[in-house]
Design a protein with these regions (language model features):
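C-terminal motif of bacterial Sec signal peptides marking the signal peptidase cleavage site
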Residues: 15-18
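Membrane-embedded translocation segments of transport machinery
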Residues: 232-238, 247, 261-266
Length: 269
């Protein structure tokens, strides 16, 4: 397999930064966990007898001050912006500095260096933390704006949820068509994501498939809006039995493993 330079921004329910002793870093995997401080990680390590991948201090461990530019307690947009850009901003601000100026993320820097990039999340692709790597808004509630900004993110692979802001929009623009016109393959079900040989794709899946908290056996309830309800119902009716039979994803607890593996496989081509 031909080795290529890779940058992966995986936003998931985990937290780990891997450092290499090699003089040249070729691959970077940046995992950001929601609420996974030392207390949570230590409890996990103890309960699993250390076999977690979160071995403390191996090879190094660091600390950072997390307060935002205007509050001792940060929020997701400001926290994500700090992680993505290295700049402290106001609570609520996402991808912009305290004066509202667009910031450049480390993913953008990596892309400019010729690196490939991917975002994998167990939430919507326009959630505050992943959006901090490609977007710039004054409020995390600007999901429609973030979806539009995502289409120009330059990311090679993205897998997550949140179809509604891409297709059920006030401007009546179908952003999945925009992505397709820009050379992406767009998939709305796991079967297609698992089987694709595309080098550039976006998977926008039902929320129940990517996060157990949102898993529901009732496909007419619990989704963000009608668009995702309809999609979830159609997918569940047509694919669930066959997917389980053939070993495809059937539960959210399998999502991160399979989505991460697929992204790495794609970027390594």
């Amino acid at each position: 397999m031909k080795k290529q330079t890779i940058f992966l921004a995986f936003l998931a329910l985990a937290a780990l930064v891997s450092c290499s002793k090699e003089p040249k870093v070729e691959n970077v995997i940046y995992l950001i966990g929601d609420g996974m401080g030392l207390g949570s990680i230590s409890s996990l390590v103890l309960s699993e007898d250390g076999a977690t991948g979160f071995e403390m201090g191996d090879p190094v461990i660091g600390f950072s001050e997390t307060c935002s530019a205007n509050n001792y307690v940060t929020d997701s947009p400001a926290g994500g912006t700090a992680l993505a850009t290295g700049t402290r901003t106001k609570n609520g601000y996402l991808g912009v500095d305290p004066d509202g100026n667009q910031l450049k993320s480390i993913m953008k820097d990596a892309q400019e260096m010729g690196m490939k990039s991917a975002i994998v999340v167990n939430t919507v692709l326009t959630e505050a933390t992943p959006a901090s790597f490609y977007g710039g808004v004054l409020s995390r509630s600007q999901g429609y704006d973030l979806a539009k900004q995502f289409t120009t993110s330059g990311v090679d692979v993205a897998i997550g949820s949140g179809l509604s802001v891409f297709i059920n929009r006030p401007d009546s623009v179908d952003l999945t068509e925009t992505l397709i016109n820009d050379g992406y393959d767009v998939y709305l079900d796991w079967r297609s994501v698992v089987n694709t040989t595309s080098d550039k794709f976006v998977g926008i899946l039902p929320m129940g498939d990517v996060h157990r908290r949102n898993k529901s056996t009732n496909t007419t309830a619990g989704a963000a809006d009608g668009a995702e309800v309809c999609l979830a119902a159609k997918l569940a009716a047509s694919a669930q039995e066959e997917n389980i039979k053939e070993g495809y994803l059937s539960e959210p607890d399998q999502y991160l493993c399979k989505a991460t593996a697929k992204a790495i496989e794609t970027l390594e081509r």
